[in-house]
Amino acid sequence: EINQPIVYCTPKPIYTIEDIRKFSIDPTDICRIPRDIIDDDRIWKIAMWGAPRDLELIGKMQSTFAPMASFIEENHMTTAEGFKRGNRKHQCYDFKGLPLVEAKSFKPYYVSSDELPIVDFDDFECIVKNAREIFAAPHLIIKQSHKNGTFLSEVLDYDAVFNHSLLGVHGNINKLKYLSVIIGSRVFSYYHILTNRKWLVERDELEAGDIWQTPIPSPSDAEIAEACGIFDELAVSPAKKEKAEQFVRHMYRLKEYESYQIDDVIDYVYDYFKKKQHSVS
């Protein structure tokens, strides 16, 4: 029957005591997708980890708010990935002596320059010729891989350099702080769990293009000021995120049941993926 739904099966890996990878098909791994929506690319990842109501919420976010790329363009910001050493065929002395932000020791929201190592090398593969502003203050630095399901970023008020595993955005410091508050939220992680083709499938990080496509609410001056206050508190106490989370959910105009949806995905879906058989789900 041409009107029959598509049966979509997404078995999840399980881990035995012997830690041998096996696959089993649970009833929750099978869903029936109406044929009239199979051309919507979003459904496949959402059907794997979410529910029909998640497709509605993702659609609402995408249709209500412009992508971060538009926010960046409207606010005359500069973006790029950091330098690359790789085959190290270029010599460049421009970065010598500058603070170096490294992904492995990345500190969210803010790190003082005296806590960072200094660049003591001059061999590079890519030296970011056309977007050097990303290394100039004020700048937002985004870590493309997550920590326990949360994405980290920091806003620095001094020049610093970083490699291509980090993204840089140069622009107005208050608007950068606003973006940082959003990036560290559960809403941001929820969106990418359910839309990113590779996260929770084959990669544990986001690509730059994925991040730039995140829907971002357009804030008022008062909301920017509120975000800055929240950011400054997070810079001192990064773990105290309740106020930040409430602010972000208000910006996205989330209803109470939509907030529960987001928490369910983070608390159960991500938890399942990360902790395997020890998951709360």
Located regions from the model:
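Conserved beta strand-loop-helix elements of the APE1-like EEP
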Residues: E1-Q4
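Non-catalytic DNA-recognition/assembly elements of restriction-modification systems
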Residues: F23-K84, K96-G97, V101-K104, S218-S281
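Polybasic, glycine- and aromatic-enriched phosphate-binding surface used to engage nucleic acids
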Residues: R53-A225
